[in-house]
Amino acid sequence: MDWMWLLSGACIVFTLGMFSSGLSDLRVMVAKRSVENIQFLPFLTTDLNNLGWFYYGYLKGDGTLIIVNLIGASLQTLYMAAYILYSLERRYVVSQVLVSLGVLFLAHCYFTLWTPDINSRLNQLGLFCSIFTISMYLSPLADLAQIIKSKSTKCLSFPLTVATFLTSTSWVLYGWVQSDLYITVPNFPGIVTSLLRFWLFSRYPPDQPAYSLL
């Protein structure tokens, strides 16, 4: 049973390591008192994803999911608060947050009022969270296509790629051990996109010129 605790610990450490990548953006915003070219949407979508999986873990009684996503949601909320504080488009950003809160409220009403059966609630929430997670992992594909076109990986973060690969792999194993497809399936795309990034790093090293004269 010790190996299960080890796997759970790996999920927590690797996932929190991936979530903490936003600390570098936080330092930039605080130091320059500006959001620079930092995007707000990744913070918001990750926060929503964390809250969804937190509720799933709560319904399932899974301490690993609860811990990871509670801390993750707290970090994303911190990043969003700093972004709102230093953004010049504060009204637009706040409107996005309010719309998201409205969606969360409607989802809460649906799952608590119209889905009283705990198993149905768990299955529907698991399906929703899985689809949302898959879409997040696949969303950077357009950027990867642009990297192939420009033959430059300067905009990619190698440490974040490693963290994403380790996180996705640990959750695939965790879900497989627990026979939970809602955890296993949505993390496969994370492995695939990470392997694709590794290939791009080997094909187009960061110190390599983006274009050749030949």
From Swiss-Prot:
Any single Gene Ontology cellular-component annotation: Golgi membrane
| Transmembrane spans | 3-23, 38-58, 65-85, 93-113, 125-145, 157-177, 181-201
Where does the signal peptide begin and end? none
Q: How does it sit in the membrane?
A: Multi-pass membrane protein
**Residue ranges of every copy of the MtN3/slv domain listed in the record:** 6-89, 124-207
The domain of life is Eukaryota
- Localization, UniProt: Golgi apparatus membrane; Cell membrane
> What GO MF annotations does this protein's record show?
sugar transmembrane transporter activity
Question: Which UniProt keyword terms apply here?
Answer: Cell membrane, Golgi apparatus, Membrane, Repeat, Sugar transport, Transmembrane, Transmembrane helix, Transport
Its annotated function is as follows:
Mediates sugar transport across membranes.
Q: What family is it from?
A: Belongs to the SWEET sugar transporter family.
Q: What is the protein named?
A: Sugar transporter SWEET1
Species the sequence originates in? Xenopus tropicalis (Western clawed frog)
